[in-house]
């Protein structure tokens, strides 16, 4: 059983989300000998992989959302997961989520590691009884013939202490490669969930490299010209971003200013949370007043803090003594929003 | 007589939990049937499990409980019948017993005459009883970690229950577990069989029906089949053997329903990576078995246990995938290794300030400073006793011991901490003794593990662990009950084991002194170490508990001495003379305790008048005491105990003839003085009164 403790020492909230996913872009197929060309031409492109997953789950009643437009360390942190799992309302949603782990950046030089990787995140609340079968069908839908592969569900539980969240589940192993994290959420924001939900997180780069049988993430075919079949690679699309953000995160980010940003975002979030506390405790406030309270905006401020912390950490600007305290500050915001959100839903 | 089958269908249960749950389910079903008088005398209970199911088959279930007759006693006969007519009391009793008043009979007991009724209890059918009772038993199974899955959270279980089979012979037992009604349909292998239900004709057909659906439900059969498949796959490489790894076999047994094995290869160039790294990647990260050549050297192959059976093309695809994953991990490891060499261990000491040891205590830099202090104290004690070792190398090793925590390789493979440090120290030419001590610092990792071979490694291991224990106790993190989050018991066990199995001239007290502990903290840790020594002697060395108590009552500081005494005592206690001596010492202790309670003074043996038997004992003891003391000094405990056993005739005669607590205070005082002296003179090896005699 692996939980995210290992990453705790590394870089806070964003990084903590999934120990397993943090390494999704690390472990990865390597040079090949036979049949690579044949595989590459027939295997799905990176974007086709996403299309297939999206349409598979849309056909099964999921809302397709767009990636959340604030920096997050994992799909779990987007409000479509972190907040929607709270309360009794059923919900099914899928979205691709670019997920930032500043400390994992390698200037685009490491074939297996990325500053920003893509998760396809799925929340099924409540989980259907055949959720595992549906998941297996989704693998068939992206071209994996299960009769010619070895599939195992191996225990892997998950926790995100800063979000007061945990669940039990598996890492799904395909021919020895971890391709998905499958979690039954049990708690979020320190609150018991009822109904619980199933969270499926597909590591897209890893799956694409597996399907295309390539050595490096940057060799993944992102798209193909429909006329000529000429490939556009992952490297062409994203390499510059990996390089420049590594430079920023490790070299250029202005530590003093990052702290200023952090403090500003935190101060505003705290002020809003203070107001929320009063409002949701009030017996005279109307339901309408409660429902218009901008908790979603408050949550964005908390996410900003989390990402800033990760950049500061990558920059080597967080000392041992500071670390625990800063994580605690982020936890106070995240858990505070979750609690207020639950109260708002009940209002 | 019927066969009963229960199968709980689950989403994949964690491998580590399956064996325990399977056994518990079998036990619970058997106990239920026994309790309810439904188990035939010759019944056979068989359990099965796979990652997706727990099952139990009972051959020999009675169709129903036997009918029983029960005698009920009601009101006294006089109250029940007045003048031959039934009273209201009789009617109420008859109603309660469910018989007509006319059926009441007179029962005569020792207390008098009562109205009685004989009631027939019709036995409940197995179907009815199982339907009512079994769900509670299933939901009562212990799991290390549970979850909820249904709305309203009606039950907790390890993973969602997805189907239930409950059958008595060919008939379904109508029970419901976690909202799932039992039926006669099981499920087969996810991929090889697919989603079609596997209908069972009868309970007894379970194992064979599932085999047809590509599931081997019997754990022993899967284990056997995996071992055979590992052998077979390995035989394709001349001279090769797979590296035996029983825990890994158990894991893959519980990860598969229809196992097969493939042999994969990797490029020989990766064999230049340390074997420790290669094996960790294969075993811990990928659950692959390592393969070795005829010289027990790692060979460039691995064995993966699959949960499927593929055709040749499929096998090629699966092999290719597994090889790629493994090689990518090896490449990562090599990358980390090369990257880490850019910053030698000696330049990493400062960065330990960035690694937290314990937030209330400090960083690993702080920890290293502390360890250096403890090590210097222990080194001085060892030097004084004349044991040779390389002190410079030791201090260097302590200084660098934790620096591997800052390396990428250890961040990736945390289980290799210490080992990586040792390998790096060697690669960086810091000296073989330094490297070895760092490498061995965490051994023994378990009670079965060996202790470090080098004196430097032993001292580093002792200093590191005692420092941790004392510091953790100091901030209130001592283990309590089953909670030991900082693994302090394991650390203390390792201290005891190192002292027991090394030649270090150190005792528990001298180790504790070296830690600089004082006051209440020191007393607490001292007691904790003694408790671990008790555990070591009893559970690791298997000495009888009374021998352990006896030996430790006479001294629990010098670990190797305690072992020697325990060995001698274990051998000696079997003799009849020694048993008698033990009994006598127990008696002496009791008498002295009584005397103390009554306020009797211990007098003077010499001045007092002694009876002949008492005098004989006094003389024999006086003659023997210096001999025993000399043997004890030489640690010739076996001989010393044999000498003590020779006291038996005079001790027996003394207790036969002498009334110890004589009414005359002077005589009594002399006797007490005598036996007190005997006890003191001969209890230095063990407190014999602790020995349990027949």
What are these regions (language model features)?
Chain A
Residues 20-283, 289-345:
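Structured aminoacyl-transfer and RNA-binding surfaces used for tRNA recognition/handling
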